[in-house]
Each structure stands twice: as C-alpha cells, then as structure tokens.
C-alpha cells in the first residue's frame, strides 16, 4: 500500500520496504510582502475609552465609538485623528493617557449600582433604563455619541450577566449581596471626570509588563507616531530612543509662541540629533474645527498626517496641507507675516522644520523643509527615515522564515531571490529609481560573505545595499535672456 508524507518528514535515505512513497511539497514562495508605512500612532487625552491600551481605527467614526467626542484641548487625541485624516491618513493606533485622577461616571437604579465602563466626562451622558417586557425585563443603555445597547433577562442577575458578556458594553452593573427584584426606572450617569492635564511623563509612560503612554505603541507597527500637544524638551531623547528601537518616525513640536532663537537653544540643550525624530517649530496653527470652532493646535498632526498619506520615498516638503486658517506667525487674517530666508535658514540648519505659507509651489500651507532633527546631511531627510524604516520592517517581518533551514547553496539562492524580488518590486512601483541606467540595489549572499568558518557556527549573512532617490530641495534654473542671446535648438524649426 502506498504511503503519503509531508515533504521533510520522511528520511528517504533509510527506506527498507519496497513501496510507493508520495511526498507532498508545500508551494514554495520566495516573495516578501512590504510592511505598512502609513500607520499613525497617537498618544493623547480623551473623555472616554481604555487608558494605556492601543486601539486600532481607520478614522473619526471609529474614534467616536471608542473614545467619544472630540474635546477642546490641545492634547486631545480625537483632534489629532481628525487633522491627520484630513491630510489623507487612514490607519491609526490611539492610546489614551490620563494623570490618574480620572473618575468613572456612576448612578443607581434602586439598590443596583451602575458605573460607566471607562473613566471620563463622556460617561456623564449615558442613560440607563429598565422596563418590563413580556418575557422579563429589558435594560437599555444609550449615549448620543458612544451608541446604544439593549439587554434582556428575567432578573437582575440575568441582566448583569448579559452586560458582562458584552465586551463593548458602556456600563458595568454591581449587584448587592441580596439582589432585589427588578423595578422599572431610568438614570443618567454623573460624576465622571477626565482628571487634570497629563504631564510629559504620563505621555511617555512606562515600558514595563503593562505598558502605558508612548510605550503602549510598542509592537503595533506604527510607521509614524506623536505625543499630541506635548512640547516638553525632556521627552525628546526618550522619543528618539523609542523611534530608533521601533522603526517609528516620531513627530515632536516646540511650545506655542516660540521664537527662533529659543527653539534653536532648547533643541541644542536637549541633545536631540536623531533621524528618528522630526521636530516642528512652535509656530502653532489655527485650525477650523467642526465642533469647537477655530482652535490653536500643535503642528504635529498636520506633519504626521501628510507623511502617513505619502509613500515612504516621499518628503513632506511642499505638500499642501488642509484645514489651516492661519498661524501664530501670520495670524488669522492670512499670511500677513512670513518667514525671512534668514529665519528659515536658522531653523533648518538647527534641524527644526516648520509649517508656513507661502510654500515653494505657491500660496498654500505646507511643511517647509522636509527634514528630521539630525545634523547629518546624508540622513536628515524625511525620505531617509521613512524608507529605511520601511525596508527594515519589511525584512524583519518576512526573512525570519529562513531561520532553521540547512545552510547550502540553495539557501543562499533562495535568500538572494527573495531580497532581489522585494527590491525589484520597490523599483517597479517607483519607490526606488534607476539612475544612469544602473540598478539602485545589490544583494550578496553566497560563499564570499559566508565562509565555512561562519556557517559552521550557524551564521548566515546577506549584504544588501540600496540607493535611495534624492529629493529636489534646491531647484536652480539658469536663465539667460536678451536680444543678443544665441539659442541653439535640438533640431528642426518652429
């Protein structure tokens, strides 16, 4: 009788019984899928939702369901989501932070205590009602923004169990030792508090078993992240370390109403000099909010939003931004005051970017430099940080399949094929580009960089070199005009 095996489970050099042996080989794929380059992590405040836990979402509708309405606060996470989404961002991970003095709203229905599932002022709008039905009782929970839910049961124990089984329930029901009969009634929860304004330390959080703040974004695959409204320079180095470790481009900002001289001095004193952090000048922007009207907000979400919407080889330089109606520099009435070349030069030389109007392309709001905070010209572009992180994350996410395989020429060939295939796809999609007819990448993985002395110890090495495309930052047009100018045409006549 013939036997069927999965390939690799049968030692075909030790067969003793004459028979038919069928080995099923799994389809081999040498492809490598790119990592996400658009996910934006936001750490901010909110009036509802879990604290210290990253919540994935696609836009404002998801945010409203998870964290409630936007608040009139510069640290509000919903404000950042709204601004970034308007620039084209569509993938978020939001972490709510508090100062620890937040309180959940509560109320009672007779002897039954009802408490909001999360802390915050949004819980004050939750209405809980109990009514009799033909089969028992109905417990109705509703909120104008957070939604509603209905539960049914024959008594309070059944109703409480139904609420407990709902992972998205807006309330928790606490029963006394002696559970009373159900009595129809209604209550609006009250007493919910957001607490005070969290400190920069609260926003950074703790990198422990239970992570909080910025560290809650660890492992979430965020290509870009920001601590919304935080301008404390003591957090810059921590953001840089996190960004380097996670492959995340951190967007920081200076305080509102900052000056060029102070911004340069503060950055120098903080020691920030890293391609992992983009530092925006503290010229905060006037934003036209659909709920709270005109608000003065940090430039972080604008820069992060446009970067999230762009392919990783792109720069934020000169890309039009939406929703801005003015800035501290220019005022609300239009671009009445603009930056001088000297001011821009001072900021850019110090590794500080700014959003202003006009931009090189015309009278619109845009990021003016497209640089990170590094002082090294070879690594200070948005495109360097984002494309390097993208390629590294893609390799980290797919090349691990080769660990544990036997080291031989076939393995070297498969590794090369996978890497070359991935880089070729970047070339075909315009993320990489041919210059002077030469491929912008090379891969070496053979005996030349894997001698037996190394492979015998379990090491395999692939050397990958990738040349990025430059960004046109200083466009020079040489014009010669006059009646005496001789013009040479390439051929033909008009």
Predicted regions and their residues:
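A glycine- and small-residue-enriched flexible loop/hinge signal that marks low-structured segments
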Residues: 1-415, 422-449, 455, 494
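C-terminal edge-of-domain segments
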Residues: 447-494
